[in-house]
Amino acid sequence: HYENFGPHCIPSCLVVTGDIDLSAHAQTLGMAGGPIPNNEPLARHILETGYADDIDWAFSKSLGVDHSVGVPYHMSLKKLPGVRIIPIYLNCVVAPFIRNRRAYQIGQSMLRAVQSWSGDERVVVFGTGGISHWVGGPGMGHVNV
């Protein structure tokens, strides 16, 4: 996403291990901005498990997020007490794209991380992006089918 990284630095795969903020894109999306709670310990565990699995994660200790995180959070999770998120990005936007096999390996590593996590949180994965959504317009929240 150019909104997150610009055209100058597009990571193949990235996990956000720190602060998450929607402020920069909130007005465009028509929603309240501000911080979004991150499950930092689990994010670091996913990162470290990935490194042990030879996943070459990039990581961000602070990231202003756009519609790809803000809309699902706002519509599904914001009103639930205690819910924390971990944004994870795979480059499917700018060539060279992450290879399917590598994306699968990352998913398997994430599964191992969650299964080996000592916490008692329930973990849900949201897949967002692609050409399946209207961003910042009157159709926001509806799937383009």
Regions found by a protein language model. Give the residues of each.
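Soluble secreted/lumenal catalytic domains
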Residues: 1-145
